[in-house]
């Protein structure tokens, strides 16, 4: 019985990892089609967070812990753990802050189409580029200039607003602006604030 449970758990984890990779790749390479798949997916509240956001935060944090420790000139272990901790706080804070902004805007201006689950999907998957670039920059710091690709988040959000909420172009522009700016800049802001409180790092 124990072996069966372990097998089922492994299969479920493997399936979830494949789904995360497929969604990540799809949103960057075939944005519209992937959003349509996400929109059709039956989800419960917090599913997008648990199945996509949390695994990505855990993975990026692990990579940052390892590589920041390896690249540190002094205080190897401390540097790795501090930067990993900052990553967790920055990404979690950015997710919940952006979700709050998205929910507030939609409730105020489009209460008829607002749904908690749809808002979670919209925000969770729109962080895709941010997560990928976090990992790339941690592994190869010299590629820091790739952060400019954060702007692709704007297109992901634009298509997400259309597919998930069926918002027309006029309204979509305003919502897209707030969501995109929050996704791109909130992690940076939180990281900067924490670093100011930790001058040794």
Task: Name each model-derived stretch.
Residues 8-9:
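Acidic, Ala/Val/Gly-enriched low-complexity intrinsically disordered segments
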Residues 12-114:
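Selected alpha-helical membrane-embedding segments in polytopic membrane proteins
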Residues 60-61, 65, 183-189:
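Hydrophobic core of alpha-helical transmembrane segments in multi-pass integral membrane proteins
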Residues 66, 70, 139-140, 193, ...:
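Helix-loop junctions at the membrane-solvent interface of multi-pass transporters
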Residues 103-188:
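Hydrophobic alpha-helical transmembrane segments and adjacent short intramembrane/lumenal linkers
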Residues 186-201:
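Juxtamembrane boundary at the C-terminal end of a transmembrane helix
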